[in-house]
Amino acid sequence: MSFSVNSSQQISIFDATANLTQREIKMLEKSWAKYFAENIFPAIDEEPFKVLYSDRPSRHNTPVNVIIGALIIKEIFQLTDEEIVETLPFDIRYQYALHTTSFEEQPLNDRTLGRFRARCNTYEERTGIDLIHQCIVGLSSEMAKMMKINTGMRRMDSLMVASSIKKMSRLELLYTCVANLAKFMHKSEDGAFPKSLIHYTEEDDHNRVLYHNRSEDTESKITQVLKDAARIITACGSRYDESSEYQLLIRVIEEQTDKEPDGNLILKSGKSDMNSELLQNPADPDATFRAKAGKDYRGYIANVVETADKNNSIAVDYQFEKNIYSDSQFVKDYLDKQPVSEEETILVTDGGYCGYENVKQAAEKKVHLITTDLKGADVADIYADFKFSEDGKEIISCPAGHRPKSNVYDINTQKCKASFPIEQCKGCPHFAECNPQLHVRVATIKLAKRTSYHAEQQRFFKTEKFKEYAHFRNGVETIPAALRKRHNVDKMPVRGLIRCRLYFGFKVVAMNVRKLVKYMSRLGKCALTPEIA
């Protein structure tokens, strides 16, 4: 299948809108479809998706902008693939939005969307390039311009995204991995399949082993499952090394068990070797575990960057990772991608993104990073008045304006040890606050630039300007709520990091389109229909 750009859509004399009455045309032009057709659809850049198709002359692809537009509409209305495909031929609003009113036959079938997603996922697995992310960020930037939002003010927040998997006990996890491999070998009619494990292929065996189970039987059943695991791994040899069932069983055995001197497998005891990256459920090998705010989460974490003004906001960037990813790493990744801007951009976040290194990195990109909280204990206020060199390796002056006699920088602690004449320090009004260490001739103080920055931020938190920034940041809390309640982000019908990332991206842009339509309706140019009100 070769790539072809769907850059122009010529209207035919048999166009679906030709038979509409004036009243029907007026209703169509007041609907969401008109604005989608005139602004969103033309902004979809098809060219980056050329790499998904063959260079050889062959049948042309289904228009990429039609596919992406359909996937966005699908998320706006929370439709399944089947519903969007079956609705398109009969709902003129969908055709109008996707510029297909003149098509003799609508270009989507029951496999179009799934195959396109598979192409994008495979390309990302091979190259690490997320074409959908690039497309959505570009669309969101255009929407921000349409809404005339000041992009110099941004805010950031993260949200946990649940994987659609159940919590498994260690017995169930081990049993499921053994059963999956047993069923795979049995289906392959492998003569080496141990006959003693045939019960794993029976439909009721799962319930018999796991649910018809007394608590005192659990240990003996785990022992038996581990023996069965060792037996089936031996029977596999090297023939199943590439199968996911075999790889997952090997993974769970390595993560959950130790080998005794006699070769038998036993469960690991204690939590010393347990970590968040352990397999949670073989149905989603990418899902990880994280405890946050007293709750346990299994799945992923997303980070969203929103630009906003007094009345409007648009999510202009996002990132989707395993849920062991930290907020601090999210802001580092975001700053790495940003070009050095001509004018300063303000980025307001919560305390999870704080850190002196993050502030320094942001400053290099002309981004003023403001966090609404700080990690660690409060420090002495006087530390804010110490002046450091640009690289933070030398104290230039103390709060009284005196230069130190000498400076020694400790690379391990990143602290400067500054020495001042002892009489000078004793006669200083800040002597008690600084609390230097006294020697025979000098008084010394050890201080890191990050500690001085911490003290500066403590002062800043008491200002009216900070209260304005904190109020601005609070607005980003609506994004997790909207994605959960309206776009069902915790109930995505796919598993795996890359697949979930693609779905999440379309939920973000669908949220943005809804905001754009509401913005236009306030201007009197477009009206929301009841379906998306």
Residue ranges and their predicted role:
Residues 1-56:
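Basic, low-complexity segments
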